[in-house]
Amino acid sequence: MKSYRKELWFNVPGRRAFINITPRVQECLRESGIENGLALVNAMHITASVFINDDERGLHQDYEDWLEELAPHEPISHYRHNRTGEDNGDAHLKRQVMGREVVVAITDGRLDFGPWEQIFYGEFDGGRRKRVLVKIIGE
């Protein structure tokens, strides 16, 4: 069995963003030479997420609206976490809802997606470098 590991780095200038990282994960798969196995893609920060969904602008805005309704950024004083001097209590909750990682089957050298599925990096507290781990195992 072969194993491949790579870190993808992001530095989102704004507070939040959804970035389609499917092409970068596909490039990792090509580099790995693995034809059949599993790809784990996970955010290595507690205010960022990796998830699978459709790459449709309206859906991204729906996520933004829904997450802000669930855990609004302001008032910052609303979050106990922010009493430590932070201002990102909402980002931790948003990440928890959106998830940490995805696992995608690899079949015949391709990510084995359903219709419309794409891999996204979700940033909820931007402004600094963060990384996503891609770990691929298989034959």
Language-model-detected regions and their locations in the chain:
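Active-site histidine-anchored catalytic micro-motif
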Residues: 1-139
